[in-house]
Regions:
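Nucleotide donor/acceptor-binding cores
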Residues: 2
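Short, glycine-rich nucleotide/cofactor-binding loops
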Residues: 5-21, 50-55
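Acidic, glycine-rich active-site loops and adjacent beta-strand->loop/helix elements
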Residues: 10, 44-48, 83-85
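Histidine-anchored nucleotide/phosphate-binding helix
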Residues: 17-33, 40
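Short internal beta-strands
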Residues: 25, 37-44, 77-81
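Short glycine-enriched, charge-decorated loop/helix-capping segments at active-site entrances
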Residues: 53-58, 94-96
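A glycine-rich helix N-cap at a beta->alpha junction
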Residues: 56-83
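C-terminal structural segments of small proteins and small subunits
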Residues: 86-119
């Protein structure tokens, strides 16, 4: 089984970088010919994407729903603890199933992954 680690850094709205990263993750889950193990690690401003109860005014895309779909597909999602704390985020404010991880966790995932993508 191929393992992929996707590390995202940009805020969920205002730029489409995180949106496109999640589109890649969704497409990989849905169209891979062989089983794929994916992990998503949100850092910097991307951590706020994990907030539960998001409402998008224009309904063009909903990052929270995309994360929930990935969780339902078995993708492990974590946010950087240091980055989350700097933004006032705690576990109880995150979408159910998303965890808070550390740099050590990210390092382990990086060393174990067949492919690492930073977006």
């Amino acid at each position: 089984m191929t393992s992929i680690l996707l590390v995202a850094h940009d805020s969920p709205y205002g730029s489409e970088r995180l949106y496109n990263a999640l589109r890649i993750a969704l497409a990989t889950q849905e169209h891979a010919e062989t089983p794929v193990s994916q992990k998503l690690f949100l850092m910097s401003d991307a951590t706020v994407a994990a907030l539960s109860g998001q409402q998008t005014p224009d309904l063009s895309y909903h990052i929270g729903q995309m994360l929930e779909i990935l969780l339902a597909q078995g993708v492990e999602i974590a946010v950087c603890r240091t980055c989350a704390e700097a933004r006032g985020l705690s576990q109880d404010r995150l979408i159910e199933g998303i965890t808070i991880g550390t740099l050590v966790d990210l390092t382990r995932h990086t060393l174990a992954a067949d492919k690492v993508i930073h977006i």
